Structure formats: structure tokens, C-alpha cells
Swiss-Prot record:
Enzyme Commission number(s): 2.7.1.170
UniProt gene name: anmK
Catalytic reaction(s) noted: 1,6-anhydro-N-acetyl-beta-muramate + ATP + H2O = N-acetyl-D-muramate 6-phosphate + ADP + H(+)
Pathway per the UniProt entry: Amino-sugar metabolism; 1,6-anhydro-N-acetylmuramate degradation; Cell wall biogenesis; peptidoglycan recycling
Keywords from the UniProt entry: ATP-binding, Carbohydrate metabolism, Kinase, Nucleotide-binding, Transferase
NCBIfam families: PRK09585.1-1, PRK09585.1-3, PRK09585.3-2
GO annotation (BP), single: amino sugar metabolic process
Lineage summary: Bacteria, Pseudomonadati, Pseudomonadota, Gammaproteobacteria, Enterobacterales
GO MF term set: ATP binding; kinase activity; phosphotransferase activity, alcohol group as acceptor
Residues that bind ATP: G12, T13, S14, L15, D16, G17, V18, D19
Highest taxon listed in the record's lineage: Bacteria
Role: Catalyzes the specific phosphorylation of 1,6-anhydro-N-acetylmuramic acid (anhMurNAc) with the simultaneous cleavage of the 1,6-anhydro ring, generating MurNAc-6-P. Is required for the utilization of anhMurNAc either imported from the medium or derived from its own cell wall murein, and thus plays a role in cell wall recycling.
Family: Belongs to the anhydro-N-acetylmuramic acid kinase family.
Protein's name according to its UniProt entry: Anhydro-N-acetylmuramic acid kinase
């Protein structure tokens, strides 16, 4: 069983940067050693946003974007190696999630698409890459997401305490770690995605720092109720979603009924939408004693306060409180999934994704010996 230093690379739906994590991993523990966040050029970010919202592009443009993202991921890895004074030979493998540009796990031909050419990463780093983690699960009838609950269970499950782990990235997803029950997990709906999209269009800011805009506004209750009527929120698990569904176009369709509203009130309403949809799913899943939050949303004081208010019987905290950086959780998970793949161990949980069986995930892109 391969053990040693692994690197995890994650570029999530929030598009706030490429997260790169270095960790030592074996069958007994995962120990984070270092991390960095690598910026995504504005032009690349916009290209990804365009394709996620259904904008047409040529095969040539698509191929170029795939290559450019692969090079970006390689640059991020090499920056971490340089910072830590490490060589390619010091790393067992890179687990790279890729950039999701479309996720459609239901219908006639279920599929999910993550781009960022792994061959570029191997060629530019000299390190074996494990990627394409989601499509095997979909081939077995699953949603292909979320995959991180398996990692949450390995690291954070408790023998007696009822726990849930909430990742608030662009999309929010919940891991159910209830003693005596199969691990559960699903996407609750938008996390930071709509809030980020709105403030970017209205104020040119990538996100609402410290929820300043949202806290200056008031929740528009009719707008909130209108958005909460979306059928995704009442859909039973297993379920997963992404930017191809909850995007700026989705928000615009709801805002058509509310002309002339204060942009800060919209921001406050979007924050409340995230908090309400998460808390409702926590309660529908039976509740928990401790909700541990990670992802960019864990740094949003308004979101954290609203979750605590909406879940009065639950201790709402961050994963940092138990020694795991909330900013690095997903990248760390894909380093761990790469270790699982190389060890020939399954990486999915059918109780979470709905797949017909457990399976080894991903494709291996070996470096030259």
C-alpha cells in the first residue's frame, strides 16, 4: 500500500483560487504539512463561468481552456514544491479534482465534466496524477457527488456524538456522520455561489468580505420565498447540483418579479437563502449535536450566526476547531482519494451517491520512471 507525501489540488465551483495541499497519508492518518492558494487569472475565471452558464464555444476554445487549466494546476503544484524545497521524487502522487464545468447526473445519459488536462500536470511537474474521480460513480448509477463525505467520515466521525460536516463552497454540501447509521451526504443547494455572483456584477468585488454588504441590507421575504420554491430544495437525497443550475441566470429569473430592489437587500436575501436551505436539510436529516463547517462560507460571520440561530440545539463550529483547516478540506480530501486509488481501495460511498456499489475512483496518469 503506497504511503508518503501526496498533493491535493482543488478548484471548486466558487472559483476563488486553486487550493493546493501537501500531506503525508497512510492507512492510519492524514497529516497536513503545507498549503497555498494560487490565483486564477480573471480571463480564465470568466471563460469557466461562461461555459458553466451554457455559453457556446468551439471545440478549439474548449481544448484551449482544458490545456490552460492543466497548466495553471501544474504551476500551483510547482509553486508549493518550491516553497517547501521539495522535488518531484519526494511526492507519491497528485490528486487533482479538475474544474467542473458541467454536472448532469440524471437523465438519458448522466454525465459530469471536469477539465484541466492531467497530462499537462504530469508533463510539467514530473509527478503521477490521479484525476477524473467522479465518472466511475456515475457509470455505476450514482450522482458522482458528493465524494468528500467518505473523507469526512474517515477523519471526523465520532463513536457516540451525532455530527455533521458542512462544506460551504460555491455549492453547500452536507456529510451526515451519525453513529449506527450509514454515512449520508448531499448538496443542499447554493453556498457562496449566488452571493459571489451578485456582488461581482453589482460592485465588482469577488466576494462579500465579512458579509459587509449583506449585513447592510434587509432580507426581502417574498423574494426569499420565491427562491425557496425551487424544486431542487424539496428533492430527496441522493442529489447533487452545480453552477450549471444555480447561476446568475437562475437569480435573474427570480429577480424579474422584484424590480428596483436595493442590491444590498438582495445580498442579504441570498445569504439567508443559503442559511435556510442548509438548516432545513440539517433538521430534515434528523439534526445533530455538532455541525462542523468548512469552506469559504465558514469565514462568513453572517452565515455562521444565522446557522447558529436557525439550529439552536446544535453546536455550530468550524473544522479548524478540531485541527483541520476549513480552507483546505476539499484539496486534502482529493489527496486522500488519490491515495485510496493507488492503494486499490474504493473512494465512493453508495449510501451517499446512490451508486450500485463501492468502487475504486479515478484515472491514473503515471509519470515517467
Amino acid at each position: 500500500m503506497k504511503s508518503g507525501r501526496f498533493i491535493g489540488v482543488m478548484s471548486g465551483t466558487s472559483l476563488d483560487g486553486v487550493d493546493v495541499v501537501l500531506a503525508t497519508i497512510d492507512e492510519h492518518r492524514v497529516a497536513q504539512l503545507a498549503s497555498l492558494s494560487w490565483p486564477i487569472p480573471v480571463s480564465l475565471k470568466q471563460a469557466v463561468l461562461d461555459i458553466c452558464q451554457g455559453q457556446q464555444l468551439t471545440l478549439s476554445q474548449f481544448g484551449q481552456l482544458d490545456t490552460q487549466l492543466g497548466r495553471l494546476f501544474a504551476d500551483a503544484v510547482n509553486a508549493l514544491l518550491k516553497e517547501q524545497n521539495l522535488q518531484a521524487r519526494d511526492i507519491v502522487a497528485i490528486g487533482c479534482h479538475g474544474q467542473t464545468v458541467w454536472h448532469e447526473p440524471t437523465g438519458v445519459a448522466p454525465h459530469t465534466l471536469q477539465i484541466g488536462d492531467n497530462n499537462q500536470i504530469v508533463a510539467r511537474t514530473g509527478i503521477t496524477v490521479v484525476g477524473d474521480f467522479r465518472r466511475r460513480d456515475i457509470a455505476l448509477g450514482g450522482q458522482g457527488a458528493p465524494l468528500v463525505p467518505a473523507f469526512h467520515h474517515a477523519l471526523l466521525a465520532h463513536p457516540t456524538e451525532q455530527r455533521m460536516v458542512l462544506n460551504i463552497g460555491g455549492i453547500a454540501n452536507l456529510s451526515l456522520l451519525i453513529p449506527g447509521q450509514p454515512v449520508g451526504g448531499y448538496d443542499t443547494g447554493p453556498g457562496n455561489m449566488l452571493m459571489d455572483a451578485w456582488i461581482w456584477r453589482q460592485a465588482g468585488k469577488p466576494y462579500d468580505k465579512d458579509a459587509e454588504w449583506a449585513r447592510a441590507g434587509k432580507v426581502i421575504l417574498p423574494l426569499l420565498q420565491n427562491m425557496l420554491s425551487d424544486p431542487y430544495f424539496s428533492q430527496p437525497a441522493p442529489k447533487s447540483t452545480g453552477r450549471e443550475y444555480f447561476n446568475y441566470g437562475w437569480l435573474e429569473r427570480h429577480l424579474r418579479h422584484f424590480p428596483g430592489v436595493d442590491p444590498r437587500d438582495v445580498q442579504a436575501t441570498l445569504a439567508e437563502l443559503t442559511a435556510v436551505t442548509i438548516s432545513e436539510q440539517v433538521l430534515l436529516s434528523g439534526g445533530c449535536e455538532r455541525l462542523m463547517v468548512c469552506g469559504g462560507g465558514s469565514r462568513n460571520p453572517l452565515l455562521m450566526a444565522r446557522l447558529a440561530a436557525l439550529l439552536p440545539g446544535t453546536e455550530v463550529t468550524t473544522t479548524d476547531a478540531v485541527g483541520i483547516s476549513g480552507d483546505d478540506m476539499e484539496a486534502l480530501a482529493f489527496a486522500w482519494l488519490a491515495w485510496r486509488t493507488l492503494a486499490g481501495l474504493p473512494g465512493n460511498l453508495p449510501s451517499v451517491t446512490g451508486a450500485s456499489q463501492e468502487t475504486v475512483l479515478g484515472a491514473i496518469f503515471p509519470a515517467n520512471p
